Amino acid sequence: MPREIITLQLGQCGNQIGFEFWKQLCAEHGISPEGIVEEFATEGTDRKDVFFYQADDEHYIPRAVLLDLEPRVIHSILNSSYAKLYNPENIYLSEHGGGAGNNWASGFSQGEKIHEDIFDIIDREADGSDSLEGFVLCHSIAGGTGSGLGSYLLERLNDRYPKKLVQTYSVFPNQDEMSDVVVQPYNSLLTLKRLTQNADCVVVLDNTALNLIATDRLHIQNPSFSQINQLVSTIMSASTTTLRYPGYMNNDLIGLIASLIPTPRLHFLMTGYTPLTTDQSVASVRKTTVLDVMRRLLQPKNVMVSTGRDRQTNHCYIAILNIIQGEVDPTQVHKSLQRIRERKLANFIPWGPASIQVALSRKSPYLPSAHRVSGLMMANHTSISSLFERTCRQFDKLRKREAFMEQFRKEDIFKDNFDEMDTSREIVQQLIDEYHAATRPDYISWGTQEQ
Protein backbone atom coordinates (compact mmCIF):
# COMPACT_ATOMS: atom_id res chain seq x y z
CA MET A 1 0.00 0.00 0.00
CA PRO A 2 1.94 3.03 -1.17
CA ARG A 3 1.60 6.14 0.95
CA GLU A 4 1.22 9.13 -1.34
CA ILE A 5 3.13 12.38 -1.04
CA ILE A 6 1.98 15.74 -2.36
CA THR A 7 4.69 18.15 -3.48
CA LEU A 8 4.12 21.88 -3.01
CA GLN A 9 6.40 24.15 -5.06
CA LEU A 10 6.52 27.75 -3.95
CA GLY A 11 7.98 30.84 -5.53
CA GLN A 12 10.79 31.17 -8.05
CA CYS A 13 13.28 28.89 -6.32
CA GLY A 14 10.74 26.25 -5.27
CA ASN A 15 9.34 25.93 -8.77
CA GLN A 16 12.79 25.76 -10.35
CA ILE A 17 14.06 22.98 -8.08
CA GLY A 18 10.66 21.27 -8.30
CA PHE A 19 10.85 21.33 -12.09
CA GLU A 20 14.29 19.68 -12.06
CA PHE A 21 13.01 17.13 -9.53
CA TRP A 22 10.12 16.07 -11.78
CA LYS A 23 12.41 15.88 -14.81
CA GLN A 24 14.64 13.54 -12.80
CA LEU A 25 11.70 11.40 -11.57
CA CYS A 26 10.34 11.06 -15.11
CA ALA A 27 13.74 9.90 -16.33
CA GLU A 28 14.08 7.41 -13.47
CA HIS A 29 10.63 5.90 -13.96
CA GLY A 30 10.70 5.85 -17.76
CA ILE A 31 7.94 8.44 -18.12
CA SER A 32 8.02 10.77 -21.13
CA PRO A 33 7.69 14.57 -20.78
CA GLU A 34 4.02 14.15 -21.72
CA GLY A 35 3.49 11.71 -18.84
CA ILE A 36 3.30 8.57 -20.98
CA VAL A 37 5.22 5.48 -19.92
CA GLU A 38 7.98 4.79 -22.44
CA GLU A 39 7.81 1.48 -24.30
CA PHE A 40 11.05 0.24 -22.76
CA ALA A 41 9.80 0.94 -19.22
CA THR A 42 8.32 -2.45 -18.49
CA GLU A 43 10.07 -3.40 -15.24
CA GLY A 44 7.02 -2.65 -13.13
CA THR A 45 8.78 -3.01 -9.78
CA ASP A 46 8.86 0.70 -9.06
CA ARG A 47 6.16 2.59 -7.23
CA LYS A 48 5.16 5.43 -9.47
CA ASP A 49 2.03 6.26 -7.53
CA VAL A 50 3.76 7.69 -4.46
CA PHE A 51 4.54 10.85 -6.45
CA PHE A 52 2.30 10.46 -9.54
CA TYR A 53 -1.29 9.48 -10.20
CA GLN A 54 -2.80 8.15 -13.41
CA ALA A 55 -5.40 10.05 -15.40
CA ASP A 56 -8.27 8.27 -17.16
CA ASP A 57 -6.18 7.80 -20.29
CA GLU A 58 -3.46 6.10 -18.23
CA HIS A 59 -0.86 8.86 -18.47
CA TYR A 60 0.95 9.91 -15.31
CA ILE A 61 0.48 13.27 -13.61
CA PRO A 62 2.65 14.53 -10.74
CA ARG A 63 0.94 15.02 -7.38
CA ALA A 64 2.35 18.53 -7.43
CA VAL A 65 0.90 21.94 -6.68
CA LEU A 66 2.72 24.85 -8.33
CA LEU A 67 2.25 28.18 -6.57
CA ASP A 68 3.72 31.58 -7.29
CA LEU A 69 2.86 35.22 -6.84
CA GLU A 70 4.50 36.22 -10.13
CA PRO A 71 4.23 34.31 -13.39
CA ARG A 72 7.74 34.16 -14.88
CA VAL A 73 8.99 30.77 -13.69
CA ILE A 74 5.69 28.95 -14.02
CA HIS A 75 5.30 30.34 -17.56
CA SER A 76 8.74 29.04 -18.45
CA ILE A 77 7.68 25.59 -17.15
CA LEU A 78 4.49 25.77 -19.23
CA ASN A 79 6.53 26.67 -22.31
CA SER A 80 8.92 23.75 -21.82
CA SER A 81 8.60 20.24 -23.22
CA TYR A 82 7.15 19.19 -19.84
CA ALA A 83 4.14 21.54 -20.13
CA LYS A 84 1.67 18.67 -20.60
CA LEU A 85 2.99 16.74 -17.61
CA TYR A 86 1.28 18.86 -14.94
CA ASN A 87 -2.38 19.13 -14.10
CA PRO A 88 -3.27 22.72 -15.13
CA GLU A 89 -5.80 22.89 -12.27
CA ASN A 90 -2.91 22.48 -9.83
CA ILE A 91 -1.17 25.65 -10.93
CA TYR A 92 -1.95 28.77 -8.93
CA LEU A 93 -0.70 32.18 -10.01
CA SER A 94 -1.80 35.23 -8.10
CA GLU A 95 -4.10 37.43 -10.15
CA HIS A 96 -2.22 40.70 -9.99
CA GLY A 97 1.05 38.86 -10.64
CA GLY A 98 3.20 41.41 -8.85
CA GLY A 99 5.07 38.91 -6.69
CA ALA A 100 6.02 39.53 -3.08
CA GLY A 101 8.90 41.90 -3.83
CA ASN A 102 11.35 39.79 -1.79
CA ASN A 103 9.40 40.78 1.30
CA TRP A 104 8.37 38.09 3.79
CA ALA A 105 5.52 40.20 5.18
CA SER A 106 4.06 40.71 1.72
CA GLY A 107 4.18 36.96 0.95
CA PHE A 108 2.63 36.15 4.33
CA SER A 109 -0.24 38.62 4.06
CA GLN A 110 -0.98 37.58 0.46
CA GLY A 111 -1.21 34.05 1.85
CA GLU A 112 -4.03 35.19 4.13
CA LYS A 113 -5.93 36.57 1.16
CA ILE A 114 -5.54 33.64 -1.22
CA HIS A 115 -5.30 30.65 1.09
CA GLU A 116 -8.82 29.44 0.29
CA ASP A 117 -8.04 29.10 -3.40
CA ILE A 118 -4.76 27.36 -2.61
CA PHE A 119 -6.35 24.95 -0.14
CA ASP A 120 -9.08 24.10 -2.68
CA ILE A 121 -6.27 22.70 -4.84
CA ILE A 122 -4.45 21.00 -1.94
CA ASP A 123 -7.67 19.49 -0.50
CA ARG A 124 -8.71 18.16 -3.90
CA GLU A 125 -5.28 16.59 -4.36
CA ALA A 126 -5.40 15.12 -0.83
CA ASP A 127 -8.90 13.69 -1.39
CA GLY A 128 -7.62 11.99 -4.52
CA SER A 129 -5.06 10.00 -2.52
CA ASP A 130 -5.87 6.62 -1.00
CA SER A 131 -3.64 7.02 2.00
CA LEU A 132 -1.83 10.35 2.02
CA GLU A 133 1.34 10.30 4.09
CA GLY A 134 2.28 13.94 3.93
CA PHE A 135 3.52 16.97 2.08
CA VAL A 136 6.87 17.97 0.70
CA LEU A 137 7.42 21.72 0.38
CA CYS A 138 10.12 23.13 -1.92
CA HIS A 139 11.02 26.77 -1.31
CA SER A 140 13.79 29.20 -0.46
CA ILE A 141 13.89 31.12 2.81
CA ALA A 142 15.46 34.33 1.52
CA GLY A 143 12.97 35.85 -0.91
CA GLY A 144 9.34 36.83 -0.46
CA THR A 145 7.05 34.11 -1.82
CA GLY A 146 8.94 30.99 -0.73
CA SER A 147 9.57 32.46 2.70
CA GLY A 148 6.40 34.45 3.42
CA LEU A 149 3.73 32.44 1.63
CA GLY A 150 5.71 29.32 2.60
CA SER A 151 5.51 30.28 6.28
CA TYR A 152 1.79 30.93 6.03
CA LEU A 153 1.16 27.58 4.33
CA LEU A 154 3.26 25.70 6.89
CA GLU A 155 1.10 27.12 9.69
CA ARG A 156 -2.13 26.29 7.87
CA LEU A 157 -1.02 22.77 6.85
CA ASN A 158 -0.48 22.01 10.53
CA ASP A 159 -4.01 23.19 11.34
CA ARG A 160 -5.70 21.47 8.40
CA TYR A 161 -3.72 18.21 8.39
CA PRO A 162 -2.41 17.79 11.94
CA LYS A 163 -1.60 14.09 11.47
CA LYS A 164 0.21 14.38 8.15
CA LEU A 165 3.96 14.72 7.89
CA VAL A 166 5.42 17.94 6.53
CA GLN A 167 8.90 17.72 5.09
CA THR A 168 10.58 20.68 3.43
CA TYR A 169 13.49 21.14 1.07
CA SER A 170 14.57 24.63 2.11
CA VAL A 171 17.19 26.55 0.16
CA PHE A 172 19.34 28.78 2.37
CA PRO A 173 20.93 31.84 0.72
CA ASN A 174 24.54 32.02 -0.44
CA GLN A 175 26.49 33.79 2.30
CA ASP A 176 29.68 34.26 0.29
CA GLU A 177 28.18 36.70 -2.17
CA MET A 178 26.52 40.03 -1.58
CA SER A 179 22.81 39.43 -1.78
CA ASP A 180 20.57 41.52 -3.98
CA VAL A 181 17.88 41.10 -1.31
CA VAL A 182 18.76 43.52 1.48
CA VAL A 183 16.07 42.21 3.83
CA GLN A 184 17.22 38.60 3.41
CA PRO A 185 18.14 38.19 7.14
CA TYR A 186 14.62 39.27 8.17
CA ASN A 187 13.00 36.91 5.66
CA SER A 188 15.23 34.01 6.68
CA LEU A 189 14.69 34.40 10.40
CA LEU A 190 10.91 34.77 10.16
CA THR A 191 10.80 31.61 8.02
CA LEU A 192 13.10 29.71 10.39
CA LYS A 193 10.57 30.19 13.18
CA ARG A 194 7.95 28.32 11.09
CA LEU A 195 10.42 25.66 9.98
CA THR A 196 11.18 25.05 13.66
CA GLN A 197 7.58 24.97 14.83
CA ASN A 198 5.53 23.72 11.88
CA ALA A 199 7.66 21.23 9.95
CA ASP A 200 8.53 17.65 10.91
CA CYS A 201 11.72 17.55 8.91
CA VAL A 202 13.72 20.20 7.05
CA VAL A 203 16.32 19.18 4.49
CA VAL A 204 18.70 22.15 4.40
CA LEU A 205 20.06 23.01 0.98
CA ASP A 206 22.73 25.60 1.55
CA ASN A 207 23.58 27.64 -1.55
CA THR A 208 26.97 28.57 -0.08
CA ALA A 209 28.00 24.91 0.04
CA LEU A 210 26.31 23.97 -3.23
CA ASN A 211 28.29 26.69 -5.02
CA LEU A 212 31.52 25.46 -3.44
CA ILE A 213 30.79 21.89 -4.50
CA ALA A 214 30.02 22.99 -8.04
CA THR A 215 33.27 24.97 -8.33
CA ASP A 216 35.64 22.68 -6.40
CA ARG A 217 34.30 19.24 -7.17
CA LEU A 218 32.50 19.63 -10.48
CA HIS A 219 34.99 22.23 -11.79
CA ILE A 220 32.35 24.65 -13.01
CA GLN A 221 33.75 28.19 -12.99
CA ASN A 222 30.60 30.21 -12.41
CA PRO A 223 27.86 27.73 -11.63
CA SER A 224 24.49 28.80 -13.01
CA PHE A 225 21.23 28.37 -11.12
CA SER A 226 20.24 25.48 -13.36
CA GLN A 227 23.49 23.61 -12.59
CA ILE A 228 22.99 24.13 -8.86
CA ASN A 229 19.37 23.02 -9.23
CA GLN A 230 20.51 19.81 -10.89
CA LEU A 231 22.61 19.10 -7.81
CA VAL A 232 19.54 19.74 -5.69
CA SER A 233 17.34 17.48 -7.80
CA THR A 234 19.94 14.70 -7.49
CA ILE A 235 19.66 15.00 -3.71
CA MET A 236 15.87 15.15 -3.77
CA SER A 237 15.50 12.14 -6.01
CA ALA A 238 18.12 10.12 -4.10
CA SER A 239 16.43 10.90 -0.79
CA THR A 240 13.16 9.50 -2.14
CA THR A 241 14.51 6.37 -3.87
CA THR A 242 13.59 4.07 -1.00
CA LEU A 243 9.99 5.29 -1.30
CA ARG A 244 9.92 4.74 -5.06
CA TYR A 245 11.90 1.50 -5.25
CA PRO A 246 10.73 -0.04 -2.00
CA GLY A 247 12.88 -2.46 -0.07
CA TYR A 248 12.01 -3.94 3.28
CA MET A 249 13.14 -0.84 5.19
CA ASN A 250 12.57 2.91 5.04
CA ASN A 251 9.89 2.51 2.42
CA ASP A 252 7.76 5.32 3.74
CA LEU A 253 8.49 8.86 4.80
CA ILE A 254 7.95 8.30 8.52
CA GLY A 255 10.47 5.44 8.42
CA LEU A 256 13.06 7.75 6.91
CA ILE A 257 12.37 10.56 9.35
CA ALA A 258 12.01 8.48 12.52
CA SER A 259 15.51 7.08 12.31
CA LEU A 260 17.04 10.54 11.92
CA ILE A 261 15.09 12.68 14.35
CA PRO A 262 15.08 11.36 17.93
CA THR A 263 13.97 14.67 19.47
CA PRO A 264 11.26 16.73 17.78
CA ARG A 265 12.84 20.19 17.53
CA LEU A 266 16.22 19.06 16.21
CA HIS A 267 14.87 18.17 12.79
CA PHE A 268 17.16 20.08 10.43
CA LEU A 269 19.07 17.65 8.21
CA MET A 270 22.14 18.11 6.08
CA THR A 271 22.92 15.96 3.06
CA GLY A 272 26.03 14.67 1.36
CA TYR A 273 26.32 12.93 -1.99
CA THR A 274 29.02 10.95 -3.69
CA PRO A 275 30.47 10.32 -6.24
CA LEU A 276 29.97 13.78 -7.66
CA THR A 277 31.55 13.75 -11.07
CA THR A 278 30.32 15.19 -14.29
CA ASP A 279 33.23 13.97 -16.35
CA GLN A 280 33.52 10.35 -17.39
CA SER A 281 37.34 10.30 -17.12
CA VAL A 282 37.31 10.17 -13.31
CA ALA A 283 34.62 7.53 -13.34
CA SER A 284 36.84 5.15 -15.24
CA VAL A 285 39.74 5.21 -12.79
CA ARG A 286 37.85 4.77 -9.55
CA LYS A 287 36.18 1.61 -8.39
CA THR A 288 33.34 2.69 -6.16
CA THR A 289 32.87 0.30 -3.26
CA VAL A 290 30.46 0.58 -0.37
CA LEU A 291 33.21 1.47 2.11
CA ASP A 292 34.61 4.03 -0.30
CA VAL A 293 31.18 5.64 -0.71
CA MET A 294 30.39 5.58 3.01
CA ARG A 295 33.75 7.01 3.99
CA ARG A 296 33.47 9.78 1.41
CA LEU A 297 30.01 10.68 2.66
CA LEU A 298 31.53 11.54 6.04
CA GLN A 299 34.04 13.97 4.52
CA PRO A 300 33.03 17.61 5.02
CA LYS A 301 33.73 18.49 1.37
CA ASN A 302 30.86 16.24 0.25
CA VAL A 303 28.37 17.75 2.66
CA MET A 304 25.94 20.24 1.21
CA VAL A 305 25.87 22.60 4.19
CA SER A 306 28.77 24.90 4.90
CA THR A 307 29.20 25.17 8.65
CA GLY A 308 31.93 27.19 10.27
CA ARG A 309 34.50 25.51 12.47
CA ASP A 310 33.40 26.14 16.02
CA ARG A 311 36.25 25.60 18.45
CA GLN A 312 34.17 25.93 21.64
CA THR A 313 31.53 23.35 20.87
CA ASN A 314 32.26 19.74 20.27
CA HIS A 315 29.83 19.25 17.41
CA CYS A 316 28.67 15.72 16.69
CA TYR A 317 26.28 13.55 14.73
CA ILE A 318 22.88 12.84 16.28
CA ALA A 319 22.01 10.27 13.59
CA ILE A 320 23.01 9.30 10.07
CA LEU A 321 21.09 7.55 7.34
CA ASN A 322 23.01 6.48 4.26
CA ILE A 323 20.99 5.58 1.20
CA ILE A 324 23.24 3.45 -1.00
CA GLN A 325 22.18 2.83 -4.58
CA GLY A 326 23.58 0.29 -6.95
CA GLU A 327 25.16 -3.15 -6.88
CA VAL A 328 25.73 -3.73 -3.20
CA ASP A 329 26.50 -6.83 -1.22
CA PRO A 330 24.83 -6.46 2.22
CA THR A 331 27.81 -8.09 3.98
CA GLN A 332 30.00 -5.25 2.68
CA VAL A 333 27.70 -2.79 4.41
CA HIS A 334 28.18 -4.49 7.76
CA LYS A 335 31.97 -4.49 7.33
CA SER A 336 31.97 -0.82 6.32
CA LEU A 337 29.94 0.16 9.38
CA GLN A 338 32.32 -1.75 11.64
CA ARG A 339 35.30 -0.05 10.09
CA ILE A 340 33.75 3.42 10.45
CA ARG A 341 33.10 2.72 14.13
CA GLU A 342 36.56 1.25 14.78
CA ARG A 343 38.34 4.15 13.15
CA LYS A 344 36.00 6.65 14.80
CA LEU A 345 35.45 8.36 11.47
CA ALA A 346 32.30 9.97 12.85
CA ASN A 347 31.87 11.69 16.18
CA PHE A 348 28.50 10.86 17.81
CA ILE A 349 26.36 12.30 20.62
CA PRO A 350 27.36 11.29 24.16
CA TRP A 351 23.76 10.67 25.31
CA GLY A 352 22.56 8.05 22.84
CA PRO A 353 23.67 5.25 20.53
CA ALA A 354 25.88 5.92 17.52
CA SER A 355 23.08 5.61 15.02
CA ILE A 356 24.26 4.99 11.47
CA GLN A 357 21.56 3.35 9.43
CA VAL A 358 22.01 2.11 5.91
CA ALA A 359 19.17 1.74 3.44
CA LEU A 360 19.97 -0.18 0.29
CA SER A 361 18.09 0.92 -2.75
CA ARG A 362 17.90 -0.19 -6.33
CA LYS A 363 18.99 2.13 -9.09
CA SER A 364 16.59 3.09 -11.84
CA PRO A 365 16.89 0.47 -14.59
CA TYR A 366 16.30 3.14 -17.25
CA LEU A 367 19.13 5.53 -16.49
CA PRO A 368 22.70 4.73 -17.51
CA SER A 369 25.04 5.37 -14.62
CA ALA A 370 28.78 5.88 -14.60
CA HIS A 371 29.19 4.39 -11.13
CA ARG A 372 28.48 1.00 -9.65
CA VAL A 373 27.62 2.48 -6.29
CA SER A 374 26.48 5.93 -5.30
CA GLY A 375 25.37 7.18 -1.93
CA LEU A 376 23.36 9.89 -0.28
CA MET A 377 23.88 10.73 3.36
CA MET A 378 21.13 12.38 5.34
CA ALA A 379 22.57 13.47 8.65
CA ASN A 380 21.35 15.18 11.76
CA HIS A 381 24.44 17.04 12.95
CA THR A 382 24.66 19.68 15.68
CA SER A 383 26.96 21.95 13.64
CA ILE A 384 23.99 23.00 11.53
CA SER A 385 23.34 25.49 14.32
CA SER A 386 26.21 27.60 12.95
CA LEU A 387 24.07 28.27 9.88
CA PHE A 388 21.33 29.67 12.12
CA GLU A 389 23.87 31.66 14.14
CA ARG A 390 25.06 33.30 10.93
CA THR A 391 21.49 34.29 10.06
CA CYS A 392 20.95 35.66 13.59
CA ARG A 393 24.11 37.78 13.43
CA GLN A 394 23.00 39.34 10.16
CA PHE A 395 19.50 39.85 11.53
CA ASP A 396 20.81 41.56 14.68
CA LYS A 397 22.86 44.03 12.63
CA LEU A 398 19.81 45.16 10.68
CA ARG A 399 17.41 45.03 13.63
CA LYS A 400 19.66 47.19 15.79
CA ARG A 401 19.58 49.96 13.20
CA GLU A 402 15.92 49.25 12.42
CA ALA A 403 17.03 49.14 8.79
CA PHE A 404 14.48 48.67 5.97
CA MET A 405 11.63 48.33 8.45
CA GLU A 406 9.26 50.53 6.46
CA GLN A 407 8.82 47.76 3.85
CA PHE A 408 7.48 45.49 6.58
CA ARG A 409 5.40 48.14 8.32
CA LYS A 410 3.07 48.31 5.32
CA GLU A 411 1.65 44.86 6.11
CA ASP A 412 -0.91 44.14 8.83
CA ILE A 413 1.27 41.74 10.80
CA PHE A 414 3.83 44.52 11.48
CA LYS A 415 1.47 47.51 11.46
CA ASP A 416 1.64 48.20 15.21
CA ASN A 417 4.90 46.60 16.32
CA PHE A 418 7.71 44.22 15.40
CA ASP A 419 6.95 41.62 18.08
CA GLU A 420 6.73 38.89 15.45
CA MET A 421 10.39 39.47 14.52
CA ASP A 422 11.57 39.45 18.10
CA THR A 423 9.63 36.28 18.95
CA SER A 424 11.12 34.61 15.87
CA ARG A 425 14.58 35.65 17.02
CA GLU A 426 13.96 34.08 20.46
CA ILE A 427 12.67 30.83 18.97
CA VAL A 428 15.68 30.49 16.66
CA GLN A 429 17.96 31.24 19.64
CA GLN A 430 16.28 28.44 21.61
CA LEU A 431 16.88 26.13 18.65
CA ILE A 432 20.59 27.07 18.56
CA ASP A 433 20.85 26.56 22.35
CA GLU A 434 19.25 23.15 22.08
CA TYR A 435 21.68 22.06 19.35
CA HIS A 436 24.57 23.14 21.60
CA ALA A 437 23.02 21.29 24.54
CA ALA A 438 22.75 18.15 22.40
CA THR A 439 26.55 17.95 22.26
CA ARG A 440 26.71 17.40 26.04
CA PRO A 441 25.96 14.22 28.03
CA ASP A 442 23.35 15.97 30.21
CA TYR A 443 21.14 16.82 27.21
CA ILE A 444 18.53 14.28 28.34
CA SER A 445 17.67 16.48 31.32
CA TRP A 446 18.05 19.72 29.31
CA GLY A 447 15.09 22.02 29.60
CA THR A 448 13.85 20.49 32.85
CA GLN A 449 16.13 22.63 35.03
CA GLU A 450 14.84 25.88 33.58
CA GLN A 451 11.15 25.48 34.36
From Swiss-Prot:
Q: Where in the cell is it found?
A: Cytoplasm, Cytoskeleton, Microtubule organizing center, Centrosome; Cytoplasm, Cytoskeleton, Spindle
Q: Which residues carry this modification: Phosphoserine?
A: 131
What keywords would UniProt list here?
A: Cytoplasm, Cytoskeleton, GTP-binding, Microtubule, Nucleotide-binding, Phosphoprotein
Molecular function in Gene Ontology = GTP binding; identical protein binding; microtubule nucleator activity
User: Out of the domains of life, which is the source?
Assistant: Eukaryota
Task: Specify whether Phosphoprotein is a keyword of the entry.
Answer: yes
Q: Does the keyword Phosphoprotein apply?
A: yes
Q: Which InterPro entries match?
A: Gamma_tubulin, Tub_FtsZ_C, Tubulin, Tubulin/FtsZ-like_C, Tubulin/FtsZ_2-layer-sand-dom, Tubulin/FtsZ_GTPase_sf, Tubulin_C, Tubulin_CS
Which GO BP terms apply? cytoplasmic microtubule organization; meiotic spindle organization; microtubule nucleation; mitotic cell cycle; mitotic sister chromatid segregation; mitotic spindle organization
User: PTM details?
Assistant: Phosphorylation at Ser-131 by BRSK1 regulates centrosome duplication, possibly by mediating relocation of gamma-tubulin and its associated proteins from the cytoplasm to the centrosome.
Role of this protein: Tubulin is the major constituent of microtubules, protein filaments consisting of alpha- and beta-tubulin heterodimers. Gamma-tubulin is a key component of the gamma-tubulin ring complex (gTuRC) which mediates microtubule nucleation. The gTuRC regulates the minus-end nucleation of alpha-beta tubulin heterodimers that grow into microtubule protafilaments, a critical step in centrosome duplication and spindle formation.
Family stated for the protein in its record: Belongs to the tubulin family.
Query: Can you name this protein?
Result: Tubulin gamma-1 chain
Origin species, per record, is Rattus norvegicus
Phylogenetic classification of the source organism: Eukaryota, Metazoa, Chordata, Craniata, Vertebrata
